[in-house]
Amino acid sequence: MFDSVFKDIRYELTRGNTLTKIILINCAVFIALLLAKIIITTVNGGDSNIYYLFTNWITLPTSFGQLMYQPWSLFTYSFVHEGLLHILFNMLLLYWFGAIAGDLIGDRRIFPIYFYGAFFGGLF
């Protein structure tokens, strides 16, 4: 059963459109962070401070001064989602509006728009 799911995911990553790849990458990062949170919290006896230190390192800081010390967060924050509803609605909206944008401007331009949107959204 899981073998066919992994085959479908592998197929979409190799031959799917850009929008599907972005959604799958976001979901993979969400699952990886969720597993990391579970493992770190379990190993540390319920203390998840190390997890929050890591997520603070990859999420967008609130002050511009702190952004100068972690400029990579302008790119990584767009892949970090904290809750199930957060990622669900973000990916639904990305799928719906991304499909419309892909039809209008072409599939090749979806990733640059996502990338620049995340970058400038983080700046402003």
Predicted regions and their residues:
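C-terminal transmembrane module of polytopic alpha-helical membrane proteins
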Residues: 1-18
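N-terminal TM1-TM2 helical hairpin plus the immediately adjacent luminal interfacial "cap"
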Residues: 15-124
